[in-house]
């Protein structure tokens, strides 16, 4: 059976000052911010997991002079270690994370302060043999039997589903000059097993904000 060998949680904190790139206009007012984590390397050694990646922070703002909307992206390096007693280099790690308390404050028109907390949840599973009693020879011991349906692990893996599609703008929409902001959210997911495969069906809701040609 598959059981948890070890699990742990760790937090990475960010408190960084970020200079606005020279090609971007001065910031007049912050509108919205978001962030995600990109993992570049997850390496297991004896008793610990080493994580390397980046925190990608996106910002939408109004320019100080023109009053137009602009966007910029900041990449903050991430280097974290999670202690997991008993794990080895060949073990498989299931890693999840959650971004908490993301805040972006303007120091002045050319500098921002970015704060965030990222909580990592790590779980290492292992296959184990479990012995179960099937009978008792002592006549003074009462025995109650019951049929139990057992399931065995057939596949333990992960995969990436890549979606590529073209969207034609409505005729009353201007042509795209610059893409400022986007958000994508999967909806109505339906997973069904097939022969040697897993069928995934659903919708991807996409929101776009862009500047058009004048």
Segments predicted by a language model, with ranges:
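Viral structural modules
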Residues: 1-214
């Amino acid at each position: 059976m598959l059981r948890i060998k070890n699990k742990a949680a760790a937090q990475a904190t960010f408190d960084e000052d970020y200079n606005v790139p020279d090609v971007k206009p001065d910031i007049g007012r912050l509108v919205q911010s978001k962030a995600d984590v990109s993992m570049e390397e997850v390496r297991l050694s004896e008793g610990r997991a080493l994580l390397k990646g980046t925190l990608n922070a996106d910002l939408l703002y109004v320019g100080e002079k023109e009053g137009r909307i602009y966007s910029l992206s900041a990449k903050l390096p991430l280097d974290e270690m999670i202690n997991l007693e008993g794990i080895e280099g060949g073990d498989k790690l299931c890693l999840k994370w959650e971004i908490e308390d993301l805040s972006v404050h303007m120091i002045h028109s050319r500098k921002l302060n970015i704060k965030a907390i990222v909580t990592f949840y790590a779980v290492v599973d292992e296959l184990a043999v479990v012995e179960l009693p099937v009978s008792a020879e002592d006549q003074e011991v009462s025995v109650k039997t019951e049929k139990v349906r057992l399931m065995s692990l057939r596949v333990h893996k992960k995969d990436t589903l890549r979606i590529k599609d073209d969207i034609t703008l409505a005729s009353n929409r201007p042509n795209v000059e610059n893409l400022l902001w986007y958000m994508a959210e999967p909806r109505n997911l339906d997973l069904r097993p097939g022969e040697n495969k897993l069928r995934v069906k659903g919708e991807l809701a996409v929101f776009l904000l862009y500047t058009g040609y004048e």
